[in-house]
A protein has these predicted regions:
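Long, contiguous internal "core" modules enriched in hydrophobic/ aromatic residues
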Residues: 108, 120-171, 187
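Generic hydrophobic-segment detector
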Residues: 17-18, 123, 176
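Short, extreme N-terminal leader segments that mark the start of a protein/domain
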Residues: 1-54, 59
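Aromatic- and glycine-enriched beta-alpha-beta binding-site module
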Residues: 57-119
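Sequence-level detector for tyrosine residue identity
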Residues: 7, 16, 49, 77, ...
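Active-site nucleophilic cysteine motif
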Residues: 176-189
């Protein structure tokens, strides 16, 4: 069994609630296995909230809007470069380490390569985030990720309208025991 959060939008801070759903984990790396997990989480959520319309936000989503809103596909405009880049790249390139290193070249690789870049693991302690000349503290933990994600949605009017059709957000790959930020939380906000 596994547990994953569903983020539900609300009108007061922190602007979301979390419902943890326990489900039978379908192991494996195949997309079909990941989609079985998505379905299991959503089915469990609908048992609690029968009127719910949840959306998986990931490249494995069963709904195209969820794929478009994934950090690998949702684009964020970077004023200095006069170009848009995937959220994943902006997030990884925004990390600033204790020696002052910031790997802005991660904007120019695939989102998968940006996420897996070895330098991110070997550069010491993360001290802050930096984007467009603005520094972001590490606490609250998801501040920077939420900032770039929400602004990217605002920049995309079509997706900003589509996201309103849903009232619960998941990111099945996100494990709160191992990670801090999730696109599901950002979408709920």
């Amino acid at each position: 069994m596994a547990v994953r959060p569903v983020y539900i939008p609300k009108n007061s801070a922190p602007f979301y609630d979390i419902v943890n759903i326990e489900f039978k984990w379908n192991g494996g790396f195949a997309v079909s296995q990941k989609q079985k997990n998505i379905k299991a989480i959503h089915d469990g959520f609908k048992l609690i909230y029968p009127e719910a319309n949840p959306l998986e936000i990931s490249s494995k989503s069963l709904i195209q809007t969820g794929v478009e809103l994934s950090a690998f596909n949702l684009m964020k405009y970077v004023p200095e470069l006069k170009k848009s880049f995937p959220i994943e790249n902006v997030y990884q390139a925004g990390k600033v380490f204790e020696n002052g290193c910031q790997y802005t070249d991660l904007m120019l690789v695939s989102p998968k390569d940006a996420k897996r870049d070895e330098r991110l693991k070997n550069s010491g302690k993360l001290t802050m985030f930096r984007f467009s000349g603005q520094n972001f503290p590490l606490v609250p933990e998801s501040l920077f990720y939420n900032y770039i994600y929400i602004n990217a949605i605002i920049e995309n009017e079509k997706l900003a309208k589509k996201i309103l059709d849903f009232n619960g957000f998941t990111d099945t790959e996100f494990n709160p025991q191992k990670s801090i930020s999730t696109q599901a939380e950002s979408a709920a906000i």
